[in-house]
Amino acid sequence: MKTPENRRSWGSVFLIAFCLLLLPHAALAWPGLVIGISDGDTITVLRDGREQVKIRLYGIDCPEKRQAWGNRATQATKRLCVGKMVDVQEIDIDRYGRTVGIIMLPGGHTLQEMLVSEGMAWVWPKYCKLPVCREWSEAEAKAREGKIGLWQDVEPIPPWEWRWSGNQMKR
């Protein structure tokens, strides 16, 4: 016999299941092999040994290739992850169809944290909204104070400002 309590408990189960379905795919993480680098903040990861997925690094922005420190940022990204197995936490899809994600390196650090710590990237406040962004911002502050990487320059220009100051036309 169906009692009001049974209906409520089944209703709760369905409500919880429905809410879980609505969660963004940000909670999904998958392993893959880094097989390529487009620039400092875009990598290609081989998923399941067959699918190439272009990943835009969540929450940070590296200098553009034609910008000061751009080539060094690309080389740092290559050194840190090419040929390594990583875990990709999908956050979003950008307007170019790339997966936006957090890359967990072997050893437990994120690629984002490493690039920011080495002074090869800025935390991008407009897009970095997750709790981990606070840690990355602290790492950026330490790199800035220590004049590490791009912070050696007197006034480094964030890539988002550089792109929209007319330099994107020179690419």
Name each model feature, range by range.
Residues K2-L15, C19-R171:
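Small beta-barrel nucleic-acid-binding modules, primarily SNase/OB-fold domains
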